[in-house]
Design a protein with these regions (language model features):
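C-terminal domain-tail junction helix/linker
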Residues: 149-173
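Active-site- or DNA-interface-adjacent structural scaffold in DNA-acting proteins
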Residues: 1-18, 32-34
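Helix-centered, glycine/charged polyanion-binding patches within enzymatic domains
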Residues: 66-144
Length: 173
C-alpha cells in the first residue's frame, strides 16, 4: 500500500506526483558558515538538481558579508554535485571562489595534517539539527512560504541559542 499527497497540496515547491516518476517531497538548500550556523535557506521540489538552487541560496543570505577582494576572497566549499558550468557560474556570480572536492579527496588531504578534519559534514549536521524540529521533519504545511518561515524560525532559534552559549547566558524558553 502506498501513500502519497496530491501535487497541489504543496504548491510549486513539492516534487512531481510519484506516479509521474518524479521524486516527491521538498528539498531544503542550506548555506552555512564554517561552524554550521545557517546563513541562508531555500526550498524547492525534491526533483530539482542542487546546482540549480545554488544561485537562489546565495541570494538568500541574510547577513551582510564583506565585499570580496583579491586579498580577501569569499570562499564557498561545495560537493561534487556542483561541479558543472551551472554551479560554477552561480558561485562566481555571487562573488565566491568555489572549492569543489570529491568525497574521498578531502579526507586524504586532511589525513596528512593533524587537527584538520574534513568539513563535508557541517551542512549535514545543521540539516540534522533542523530535522529535530517536528514541524520540519514532516512537511505539514500546504503553502511553501509557511514551510520556509518555519525553517527560518528554526535557524533564528539556532543563532539565539548559539549567542546565549557564547555569552554564558541561560537559554530562555
Amino acid at each position: 500500500m502506498a501513500a502519497w499527497a496530491r501535487r497541489d497540496s504543496g504548491e510549486k515547491k513539492v516534487g512531481k506526483n510519484p506516479t509521474d516518476r518524479g521524486k516527491p517531497g521538498t528539498k531544503t538548500s542550506l548555506l552555512v558558515d564554517e561552524q554550521g550556523g545557517p546563513l541562508g535557506a531555500v526550498i524547492d521540489g525534491a526533483n530539482v538538481p542542487d546546482c540549480k538552487l545554488l544561485e537562489a541560496t546565495i541570494a538568500a543570505i541574510v547577513v551582510e558579508r564583506p565585499t570580496p577582494t583579491r586579498q580577501s576572497p569569499q570562499h564557498l566549499c561545495l560537493d561534487k554535485g556542483y561541479d558543472n558550468p551551472t554551479g560554477q557560474q552561480a558561485a562566481a556570480s555571487g562573488g565566491h571562489t568555489p572549492h569543489i572536492r570529491r568525497i574521498g579527496e578531502e579526507k586524504k588531504a586532511c589525513d596528512r595534517k593533524r587537527g584538520h578534519k574534513p568539513r563535508r559534514w557541517v551542512v549535514e549536521r545543521t540539516l540534522a539539527w533542523l530535522s529535530k524540529c517536528r514541524a520540519l521533519l514532516v512537511r505539514y504545511d500546504k503553502h511553501a512560504r509557511n514551510y520556509l518561515g518555519l525553517i527560518q524560525l528554526a535557524c533564528a532559534t539556532y543563532w539565539y541559542r548559539r549567542l546565549c552559549r557564547l555569552c554564558n547566558q541561560p537559554v530562555l524558553g
